[in-house]
Amino acid sequence: MYVAKFVYADYSVTLMVEKKKVVALLSGGLDSTLAVKTMQKQGFEVSAVAIKTPFCDFDCGRGCGFEIREKADNLGVDLKTVYLGDEYVEMLKHPKYGFGSGMNPCIDCRAMMFEAGKKHMEEIGAEFIISGEVLGQRPMSQFAPALKKIEKLSGLEGKIVRPLSAALLPPTDPEKNGLIKRKDLGMIRGRSRKEQLRMAKEFGIEDPPNAGGGCLLTDPAFSLRAKDLFKHIETPTMNDIDLLKIGRHFRLDKNVKLVVGRNKDENEMIKVLALQ
C-alpha cells in the first residue's frame, strides 16, 4: 500500500493505492535477491517462497531455515517455507523429463517448486511469479526450451517472469498486460556474474552471496549412492535419504547395505537414524 497525492488549483486529493503483488522463489543466492530487488524497484509488493527438498546441499539439514529467513527480512519481504518431501521422492522415481548428468531431475524439480509458488500466488492474489533464473546459466533447466517446459508442467504458462533475463525471452502475460515494461527487464545470459555484481553494487548489496545452495543429486558420488538406493528400495524413507549424506557405503547384497561412519559424529548420526 502506498499514498498517492493529487494537487489541484484549489484542493488536493489523497488516495491509498494498493501495490500489485508478486511471488518470488527465493533461494537466498544473489540472482533471486536481485530478482526481488528489481521488482521492488518497479513498485511491486513481493512475497517470497523458499523451497526445501531432501536433497538440498545445506549442512544444517532439514531444519535449515534461519539464513533464508534472515535474507527475507533484509529484503523486507514476507516468507513462506515449503518442504517437498514424500512427493519429491515419488517424482524422483520417474521424472517426466529425465535426469541430468547425475540423478538430478532439474526440469521436473523446478516445475514442482513453481507449483508450490503457484499455490501461494493464488492464496494471496498475486499477479505472477518471479525467479532469479538466468538464461543459459545451468545446462539442463535454464535454456529457453527447458524454461518453456517448466512453465507448461507447472501450469504457469505466461505467468513466470525471470527479471534478470526477461528481455531475451518471449513476452509474458504481465508484459502483455502492461504491468511490466521490457525496458526495465534484464538481458543477462550465461554463467558470468559480472552483470549481477554490477547490479548488486547498484542496489547497495554488500558482500554479494554466491548461488543459493546446490543440489546433492548433481554430485557424481552422491548420485551413485542415490541410484543404488532407488534400485533396491521401491520407496525410500527420509531416514534412508539422510543416511546417503554421511559415512562410507558398501553394498553387500541386494538386501543389505553397510554404512560406516568416518568419525564419532557420523557414528552418532547413524545411530540416531537407525533407531528412528
Task: Show which residues each predicted segment covers.
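AMP-forming adenylation/ATP pyrophosphatase catalytic core
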Residues: 153-276
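ATP-dependent adenylation/nucleotidyltransferase module used to activate substrates
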Residues: 5-202
